[in-house]
Amino acid sequence: LSNDFASDMRVYENDDSLLMKNFMLAALYSIEQLQAHSHLSIEDSAFFRGELERRYQKIRSIPASKELDEFASCTVGKNIFGCQNHSYGYAHVRALYGHSFEGHEDVEFGEAMFRFAIDDLSEDGALWREASRGAWSWKYTAIALGQLLSISEISRVSGSNVVEYRSPISGYTIHDA
């Protein structure tokens, strides 16, 4: 890893934050597979963890990645950066990082974001916070759903099973989205 590749971001700018999020997902999934097949030494794992940790802390600092109530305060026309698929993506990074490096709090955050999304479905099963961005944003609904399903798989392999979650608020499951 280059010491500066995907190592900094301006919190309210998509270009560098998306680069960092996507880099983190690719790196974490790669490390997960290398670890699963015993292709990383303890030293290699420590090196990668050190390189990823400082990048990860930047992602954790994004308002909608820290607190679900920040995400819940997103409304039409209000931009707290990451009210839609971006927040699901950051929760995906947090859950995967937690699974890879035994950060149960981070896996739980991903699960909480998953449950929030299901609780928040509109009557027609739409992720309305995504849809409220305008007609062009509908194409991002698939991205948001993919992030949520990835979180549910991380939850499953971590010993939980949010994919079966039925919202006590909306009555929906992920299958209704």
Protein language model regions, located:
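CBM-like carbohydrate-recognition segments
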Residues: 166-177
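Acidic/histidine metal-binding catalytic segments
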Residues: 163
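Aromatic-lined, polymer-binding surfaces characteristic
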Residues: 1-160, 171
